[in-house]
Each structure stands twice: as C-alpha cells, then as structure tokens.
A protein has these predicted regions:
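Asp-based, Mg2+/Mn2+-dependent phosphohydrolase catalytic module
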Residues: 1, 92-95, 108-109, 113-210
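Conserved phosphate-coupling serine/threonine residues in phosphotransfer and NTP-handling enzymes
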Residues: 10, 105-107
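Residue-level detector of anion-binding/catalytic polar loops
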Residues: 32, 100, 177
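Non-catalytic, surface-exposed connector residues within folded enzymatic/regulatory domains
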Residues: 63, 81, 106, 137-138
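Conserved SAM-binding loop
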Residues: 11, 83, 101, 136, ...
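N-terminal helical cap/lid subdomain that shapes the substrate entry/recognition surface
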Residues: 1-93, 97
Length: 210
C-alpha cells in the first residue's frame, strides 16, 4: 500500500507551536481568536495561514509577518519539536513490510526536512512533499489525486493519515482510505474527525498495515 502522512500533529507533536505562533499574534493584539481558527489554518500552509491571520485585524505587513513566522518556527522545528509517541517504530515496521511511505504537509521544506532528518526518519520516506510542491492546499481534492499520480499509484491503494478533519474529508472524497488521528490541539473537533475518517485512532501505533 501507499501511505501518505501529514506532518504536524501526525508525525510530530508540533501543533501547539505551529498554531500558537498565529494564535499568540492575535492575542497580543487583543484580537478575538475564532473558535475554528486552528482547524481553518491547518491545511493552508504558512503563506495562506498568515494571510488569514492578518485579515482578522493584525496591523502588520504580510512580508514582515511571514519573516517572523518563518524564523520562529525554524528555531522550534530544528531544535525542540519531538516525534509523536511510537512514530519511528511504526514507520520502520511499515517500511519493513514493504509499504511505500510518503509525507504531504502544509509546512515548508526549510524546517520540515531538517526536523525529519534530526529524528532519523527522513530516509524512510519515498517522497517528502509540501503543498508548495503542488501549488494547492490540503483543502483541495486535486492535491491528493496529483500525489497519487506522481506515485504512479491508484487512489484505492493510497492510505492518507492526518489529524485535521478538513484534510481527511477532502482526501476521502478522492477515494483514498483515510485514517484520522487524534491530536490534543484539535480535541474539540475529534467527533468531526471521527465522522469523516474510514478509521479513527488515538495513537500512531494503531495505524494498520493494510
């Protein structure tokens, strides 16, 4: 089978840091944070997430805000962000079983790749992609169909694993088998994630070898 993994909140325990940059920017400016803010920005990537955050009322240029976000996250991902429990062991198990492992994330290569290398799992993946490699967000079905095409795989042989309900629901629309994984940051949306997933799990070790 072809496994396609999200990164933030799925492989690494990073969502409090990643979303926190934007949440704290709004709070520091005394701007109310929408209830669905984290769920909304998660599939978008840094650029569109920054655009959306600024649109809520931040008095800052997009260029300066992007620079702030980039520097803050680079430091965190290259030094502090840790793998979720059981990730390395499960990935190694799936790889040994002959499955193709891949990453598709909204996070950019400049801190995605160093983080995967720091934890010694980069070479387990056949492809490590960000949405920048496609020009689409994870809220668009075309990114999943194109990923399957690039992997020379039929959609029904693809297993997509993500903690975001929007991304999971979108991937499922293409015919991929979807695994929703619980993440504490988006616990309020766990019922929604469970509803749109073919399989819902709470721990990475529960990912099946299909």
């Amino acid at each position: 089978m072809i496994y396609i993994f999200d990164f933030d909140g799925t492989l690494v325990d990073s969502m409090p840091t990643w979303s926190g940059v934007h949440v704290n920017a709004l709070k520091s400016a005394a701007i109310p944070v929408p209830d669905d803010f984290v769920q909304t920005i998660t599939p978008l990537g840094n650029y569109r997430a920054s655009q959306y955050t600024i649109s809520l009322g931040l008095d800052v240029s997009l260029e300066s805000y992007l620079d702030f976000v980039s520097k803050t996250l680079y430091e965190a991902y290259t030094t502090r962000i840790e793998l979720r429990s059981g990730v390395k062991e499960k990935l190694s198990e799936l790889k040994a079983a002959g499955h193709s492992l891949n990453v598709l994330t909204a996070s950019p290569h400049h801190y995605l790749d160093p983080c995967l290398r720091r934890h010694g799992i980069y070479d387990l993946f056949d492809k490590v992609w960000t949405i920048e490699d496609f020009g689409y967000t994870k809220a668009q079905t075309i990114i999943y169909t194109e990923a399957a095409q690039r992997l020379d795989a039929s959609i029904d042989r693809c297993v997509f694993v993500d903690d975001n309900a929007t991304a999971v629901e979108t991937a499922k629309k293409t015919g991929m088998y979807t695994v929703g994984i619980f993440d504490e940051t988006s616990k309020d949306f766990a019922p929604q994630l469970k509803a749109v997933s073919d399989l819902y799990i709470e721990d990475f070790s529960q990912i099946p070898s299909l």
